[in-house]
Swiss-Prot record:
UniProt biased composition (Basic and acidic residues): 500-517, 532-547, 567-577
BRCT domain ranges (all copies): 337-446
A GO cellular component annotation in the UniProt record: nucleoplasm
Full protein name: Pescadillo homolog
Function as written in the Swiss-Prot or TrEMBL entry: Component of the NOP7 complex, which is required for maturation of the 25S and 5.8S ribosomal RNAs and formation of the 60S ribosome.
Entry superkingdom: Eukaryota
Gene Ontology terms: biological process: maturation of 5.8S rRNA from tricistronic rRNA transcript (SSU-rRNA, 5.8S rRNA, LSU-rRNA); maturation of LSU-rRNA from tricistronic rRNA transcript (SSU-rRNA, 5.8S rRNA, LSU-rRNA)
InterPro entries, alphabetized: BRCT_dom, BRCT_dom_sf, PES
Gene, per the UniProt record: NOP7
Any Pfam family hit: BRCT_2
Principal location class: nucleus
Coiled coil: 489-589
GO terms, molecular function: ribonucleoprotein complex binding; RNA binding
Length: 590
């Protein structure tokens, strides 16, 4: 007889581990455990049977894979967390003794960790990193829009803003933007980078009211990881396109209006060395640290060495396989129509229009930008330095206002109009980009009622404001003719209908005997006969649905009911919107 196995030593109890057990095994605090899991990409798991995984207990706990926790035991960052705990004790002891010299020495030698090896582990290829930077970009743009506070330092905000501007400058220069959508949350952008669609959200630059219930420790951990990831991605993109990284910063433009025009993207052929930032030392926070650059360069060189080693392998006697070159995708060029939409235009942007959004889109599609805000900044600087006022002629010559073809304004009426300019509202830029062609400007003239601004990634089954509602109104009228719903038909209704037909037949016989015609109003309607046939078919379909539901499990039934509920809700909402639209159109006709 074989030995009896102990309980909870195999299966789910062996494959899963609770969070408390994981923290005890790693010998770290809960905060450090969370940071480590975020860095390594480890997240809680849901076992099929929580009772078996928790060794018979039904207490609510969080589970992780035991192999994931075992994998964390050999992480170098874990050792740095332990060293930091020792460092904090030494620093507290020195400050308690009042030994400031010793405290300063300890603080200078604080343990520091790097995430470059984690980036290479989680993203073995550059394409893997590109497919996963959507959330990273959205997070960095969010922190770039936040005000500096006790939770978020000014250094983090400025660093996030610098990375975001470097990204926008690269995407605009290479003309990679494909779609844009302005929503209540912010502006969604979509770019095609090496065949990968990258989408990110840029919040509006409004004063932010930060809620008190936000856990900034978790968000700052994600920010730390995403910052390192984007440093590597940006270095790779700039390097592959032959550009100097970090880009040169024009301190004059940066101190003024700023934006992507303040970043000068220069080719490495024209620059022998990596340039330094122009301007004072306060702007040096915009630069990427030399350590990050050296790590990115080493990582890039390491990849090249690996490729060379793979090429040196002798292929004698090896089978040859035709591998699909998934990463070698055609990159769009300037000759494509996608990046040349505004190439023949010089667009003047009014001061009431958000400059950062419109300027980025126009430059990304080949246009030239002249902003009224930059002109105001120049006038203010001249007034402060020289004490004189720039005349209109000098201003026109400096900004070449005679070449302006379009002016974007967000005002209902304009006092003066310059001859030769086409005046449009900002939505014309967004809709033209999404359509891939220049739309007629008559619908977007100042003061005109704008068409619906729809998401270019919208679902096909949802309500479409641009669709014609005439077909929908005809369907509604047909539905009104059918008075009886399928579920209201029963045997009593069939008996009443048979009696009505018998009475009608009796009337026809009496009319023939008298030599007159029967009353057509008393005849049964064809629509009702059609309804009878429709209801029989629907009845059969309903019975088939019920039979199929009998074969479902309880879990499948609940899921099916949820799906039906959401579909009914969408259809009701769509019908309500169509009804409102018809009422509005009737009012406009009156």
């Amino acid at each position: 007889m074989g030995q009896i196995k102990k309980k909870h030593t195999a299966g789910a109890a062996r494959n899963f581990i609770t969070r408390t057990q994981a923290i005890r095994k790693l010998q770290v605090s809960l905060a450090d455990f969370r940071r480590l899991c975020i860095f390594k990409g480890i997240y809680p798991r849901e076992p099929r049977s929580k009772k078996k995984a928790n060794k018979g207990s039904t207490a609510p706990v969080t589970f992780y894979y035991a192999k994931d926790i075992q994998y964390l035991l050999h992480e170098p960052v874990l050792d740095k967390f332990r060293e930091h705990k020792t460092f904090a004790k030494k620093l507290t002891r020195a400050l308690g003794r009042g030994d400031l010299h010793d405290a300063k020495r300890i603080d200078e030698n604080r343990p520091r960790y790097h995430l470059d090896h984690i980036i290479k582990e989680r993203y073995p290829t550059f394409m893997d990193a590109l497919r996963d930077i959507d959330d990273a970009l959205s997070m960095l743009f969010l922190f770039a829009a936040l005000p500096a506070s006790d939770d978020v330092s000014a250094r983090l905000v400025s660093e996030a803003e610098a990375i975001c501007t470097q990204w926008m400058a690269f995407v605009a220069r290479e003309r990679l933007v494909r779609k844009v959508f302005v929503s209540i949350k912010g502006v969604y952008y979509s770019a095609n980078i090496r065949g990968v669609e990258v989408m990110w959200l840029v919040p509006f630059r409004f004063p932010q009211n930060i809620p008190a219930d936000i856990d900034f420790r978790v968000m700052l951990t994600f920010l730390e990881f995403y910052t390192t990831l984007l440093h590597f991605v940006l270095y790779k993109l700039y390097n592959e396109n032959g550009l100097v990284f970090p880009p040169i910063i024009n301190s004059t433009k940066l101190s003024g209006v700023g934006g992507i025009n303040a970043y000068v993207l220069e080719s490495r052929q024209n620059a022998g060395v990596v340039p330094q930032i122009e301007g004072n030392s306060e702007a040096k926070v915009e630069n990427v640290s030399a350590a990050v650059l050296s790590k990115a360069a080493k990582a890039d060189a390491g990849e090249e060495e690996e490729v060379e080693e793979e090429e040196e392998v002798e292929d004698d006697g090896l089978d040859s396989f035709s591998a699909e070159k998934g990463d070698a995708l055609a990159q769009p060029t300037f000759n494509s129509t996608a990046g040349q939409l505004f190439s023949n235009f010089t667009i003047f942007i009014g001061r009431e229009v958000p400059l950062d959004i419109i300027e980025f889109l126009i430059i990304a599609f080949g246009g030239k930008v002249i902003s009224e805000s930059a002109m105001d900044e120049l006038i203010d600087n001249e007034d402060e330095t020289r004490g004189n006022v720039i005349d209109e002629k000098t201003l026109k010559q400096k900004f070449n206002l005679a070449s302006v073809t379009h002016q974007i304004t967000d005002r209902p009426t304009l006092r003066e109009k310059v001859p030769g300019r086409t005046y449009v509202q900002p939505q014309w830029v967004f809709d033209s980009i999404n359509e891939g062609k220049l739309l007629p400007v008559s619908e977007y003239a100042p003061g005109e009622r704008l068409p619906a601004h729809l998401s270019p990634w919208g679902d096909a089954g949802t309500y479409d404001p641009t669709a014609d509602v005439s077909d929908a109104s005809d369907d509604d009228e047909d539905d009104e003719d059918i008075e009886v719903a399928p579920e209201d038909y029963d045997k009593d209704d069939e008996e009443e209908e048979a009696e009505a037909e018998a009475k009608q037949h009796q009337r026809e016989l009496e009319a023939e005997a008298k030599g007159t015609k029967a009353d057509p109003a008393a005849a049964p309607k064809k629509a009702k006969r059609k309804a009878d046939k429709m209801t029989k078919a629907e009845k059969q379909e309903e019975e088939d649905k019920k039979l199929r539901m009998i074969m479902m499990s309880n879990k499948q039934k609940k899921l099916y009911k949820k799906m039906q509920y959401s579909n009914d809700k969408k259809s009701d909402r769509e019908a309500e919107l169509k009804k409102r639209r018809k009422l509005n159109e009737k009012k406009e006709k009156r």
